[in-house]
Design a protein with these regions (language model features):
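Eukaryotic intrinsically disordered, low-complexity regulatory linkers and tails enriched in Ser/Thr/Pro
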Residues: 1-81
Length: 81
């Protein structure tokens, strides 16, 4: 991948140097929202906000698997039962 455009289409990161992608939950207007964020060039950046946590995780995983690390294996820690 050569660039990421933020959800609101205000910013495009060309060839970003990404160290971390993650999801955090945040209450906005009394509603729980899930933000997909990235550490790009050592700065925290909001990429998008979603009302469903599973959608946020799916977006984050799509960015990792399809765009940045291609064939690199990623281990996901199992859910607590």
């Amino acid at each position: 991948m050569y660039s990421i455009q933020t959800q609101n289409k205000d910013t495009i990161y060309y060839n970003p140097n990404i160290k971390k992608l993650y999801v955090i939950d945040k209450t906005i207007d009394n509603k729980l929202q899930y933000e997909v964020r990235a550490t790009i060039d050592n700065d925290d950046r909001l990429l998008g906000r979603y009302s469903d946590k599973s959608v946020a995780h799916e977006i984050m995983n799509d960015l990792i698997s399809d765009s940045f690390w291609g064939e690199t294996a990623m281990y996901s820690m199992p859910e607590d039962k």
